[in-house]
Amino acid sequence: MNRRSFLKLIAFTTIFLSFSLVSKSNRIVRFEHGIASGDPTPEKVILWTRVSSNSDNSILVFYEISNTVDFKTIIASGKKYADRRKDFTVKVDAKIPKRYRGQKVFYRFRAEGAYSQIGTTFTLPKDVENFKIAVFSCSNYPAGYFNAYDSASNDESIDLAVHLGDYLYEYKQGEYATDNAIRLNRQPIPNKEIVSLSDYRQRHAQYKSDVDLQKLHSSMPVLCAWDDHEITNDAWKDNAENHQINEGSFSLRKRNAIKAYYEWMPVREPKTPFNNWKRYKIGKLIDLKLLETRISSRSKQVNLNDHVSDDGNFQKDAFFKELNNVQRSLLGNQQLDFIKENDRDDQTWNLYAQQVLLATLKLPTIPDYIID
């Protein structure tokens, strides 16, 4: 079965099963936000979903993994409660039996008679000659173009997706890149700049409701890193350009954003929440490091306008003094040590996935007829 046929099958399965009426207590359970997998290792992979219901009580959710799409043989399974503490999201670090590692497997969730759609995933292969990665970033729901996710999900040649950050944006309607949101029926939810934990959860839920994004997540593992907009624009360790005094503590806002991020994303959580850098070894072909460049160690960005005097003169000496200050940091010593320790010469490719542009980026003008 190819990926296109599989996606048609799970689309039907979703319609038929995920809206089942269930339980003797008349509770309705649905999987409205899809399923996802991510952070594969040679032995394990993260599986994610979110359960919606007409009750605030906890829900016991089961996961099943099979080597066939009909699930006649279950090769791994388990259960976990979904509750209010994590916004009814469920995340499991599933161990794949040895004989199936590095191969495509199928997974699904069920709760009280309702089934999620079926997803495909895998653990990292130990031996591979070719491996294709789709890269995404800066995905703003009100602006549209999430059909790129759909295109990737239908491409049989793609093995893995990487999202480099700005998976979502914090703005309200009328602000950045919301010009076509009303016409496209993609206005931000909630219609405010997100600050509280509830705000961030609602925004994640809106993004995960997008059908094209759901297709991507169900079709392959996705490696995810955050940039600034998962918190707020131009964030650094201690503050952000788009954080005002009347929005409360930036430290609290950052914690709210990252808590919601870990709840809603198929990522393995590190012991220190902000230190979200990781390594993925894909056979002897690729050693991929996913870096964190925003909120663990980043110093405040140098602002050119801060070094222009009232009479319009550029204060060059002061600018370069700040720019070249040896105390300034982007990655921090701990992450730099991680990079040095894992800079390998036994891999064909050493890849660094991160959010900072290293060259000029020029974007073409998109004609109006494409938008329409």
Question: Each PLM stretch: what is its role?
Answer:
Residues 3, 8, 19, 24-372:
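Metal-dependent phosphoester/phosphodiester hydrolase catalytic core
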